[in-house]
Amino acid sequence: MTAKTSQTAQYFDLLSSLVLQGTGAEASLNPESVERDLQGVSELSEQGLTDFLDLANANHVLVRALEVLQRSAAAIPGHDRVVSWCETALARERARISLAVQCLAPVYKALEAAGAEVAVIKSLDHWPDLGSDLDLYTSADENTVRRVMIQQFQAKQEPRSWGDRLANKWNFKLPSMPELIEVHVRYLGQTGEQKALARRVLDRSVSRTVGGHGFRVPAPEERVIISTLQRIYRHLYFRLCDMADFAALLRDGAINFAELKRAAEVGGIWPGVATFLLLIAAYVKDYGCALEIPAEVLSAVPSRDIRVYLGGQFLRVPKGPAAGLYASQLLSAGRHADLRAMFRLPLLPPLAISALVAYRLTGNDKGVW
């Protein structure tokens, strides 16, 4: 293990401890653990604090981690440096988030006014944190989306990768905000194979008010579905925000597991959904968060000993079990005569290989993946 890798592991452990406290069944902070985490951060150099902040930002947990840290530092004498550092970083991040939500709201309303059904997916799951881009799902056609974004907001359409075209995704850059707005049009999944599941996102969406603005967002079950597609069937890694977001849903009993199973089976991804939940429960357990997952869910997990591992800045999913889950999804599409999925899912392995080759050659897979 290199010094850099060891340092990242140390920072990730600190972040996990700060963020995951209070997300277990007891939903309470451990004073001894918080004080230990505070001491660990207090001992960091200026460069160490910068690296710690970068890791928190990459995992979309900056606000949650620093809020806990700031409260602890303010309550214990001798940590003025950490208090000041937290205040500065939080003020900057909250300003970014506020601007992003203010810019997203009129886009959302304009799409609705154009006759589109629309929901904000993934982005608001991390609240009070926010991701590095903003995701929308809509049933509208791409011409409507492009017309609204370009004509009403002077947005610049970003170049589309092969993966974007398969998934029917479009990215737009607004002059007023640094984050991209990514619009998923009519389908979900890396190859755009999920049509029925995508329809459920709108049919079962719920209202949510954020920053004084109202949005439709996926119901908890569809949140799990969307993140499973992203983490288990596409990226093969989790951000720490995923662990915190879904640990909180499990803690609060917000997930209807019968409804979740019904939805996942429609898309042929029930084993992947069950694996997704197991990985979350197993990871947060190491930080004192005891979460219960029904036995009927765990029975659908093909590899009960699967665990995430730290690789780079994220928590990686082992490729072997993930390949098995992909094969299971493809077989399910065949059994159910899902022609769209049957024709599109086989395109995923060559797409992934092309992305890997592009990354190895150029250090960037954006034109492919």
Labelled PLM ranges:
Residues 2-132, 138-369:
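Conserved NTP-donor binding/palm subdomain of two-metal-ion nucleotidyltransferases/polymerases, i.e.
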